[in-house]
Regions:
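Alpha/beta-hydrolase-fold catalytic nucleophile elbow
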Residues: 35, 59-62, 84, 116-117
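A conserved short beta-strand
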Residues: 53-66
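Serine-hydrolase catalytic machinery in alpha/beta-hydrolase-like enzymes
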Residues: 1-27
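Short beta-strand/loop motif that positions the catalytic acidic residue
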Residues: 82-85, 89
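Gly/Ala-rich beta-loop-alpha elbow adjacent to hydrolase catalytic centers
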Residues: 35-40, 44
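Flexible "cap/lid" loop of the alpha/beta hydrolase fold
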Residues: 63-81
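C-terminal catalytic histidine-bearing segment of alpha/beta-hydrolase fold enzymes
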Residues: 82, 95-136
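Active-site signature of alpha/beta-hydrolase-fold catalytic machinery across serine-
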Residues: 46-50
Length: 136
């Protein structure tokens, strides 16, 4: 079911991140950041919460959290979280996006939430917000 899919995703993403780290082995890679839109945002959030690699920052645009497996990493990470969601999103309703971000907030993650009037879309304003977040 979904738990098996999450476990397979975590295994695959661990390998992907490790491959990127190995590829850039001559540089000091100490800050891995993730971001995504919709299901990509959900994937970024799930990996941040459950993955084995340390994530420095993560941004979610119109994201949500799927049903999560029982085993989870320790709470109170210093991973910075940016959550952007739209009040007019008909695909990922704002309450689902808020729930995902509240889950991180309740675990002690530093979080910045931006609520907009956008629908289920990635806007130029979102890209500017991402740039500012990752460059701060």
């Amino acid at each position: 079911g979904q738990q098996k899919s999450v476990e397979e995703f975590l295994f695959f993403t661990d390998g992907l991140i490790q491959s990127a780290i190995s590829h850039f082995e001559n540089r000091s890679i100490n800050q891995i950041s993730l971001w995504g839109f919709s299901q990509g945002a959900a994937a970024s959030l799930v990996y941040t919460m459950l993955g084995s690699q340390k994530i420095y920052s993560v941004a979610s645009i119109c994201g949500f959290l799927p049903e999560m497996p029982k085993q989870e990493k320790d709470d109170a990470s210093n991973t910075s979280i940016l959550g952007i969601f739209g009040l007019n999103d008909e695909i990922v309703p704002s309450f689902l996006a808020e729930h995902a971000l509240d889950e991180f907030k309740s675990r002690g993650y530093p979080i910045n939430i931006i609520e907009t009037n956008q629908g289920h879309e990635l806007t130029s304003e979102n890209l500017e917000q991402l740039t500012n977040f990752f460059n701060s």
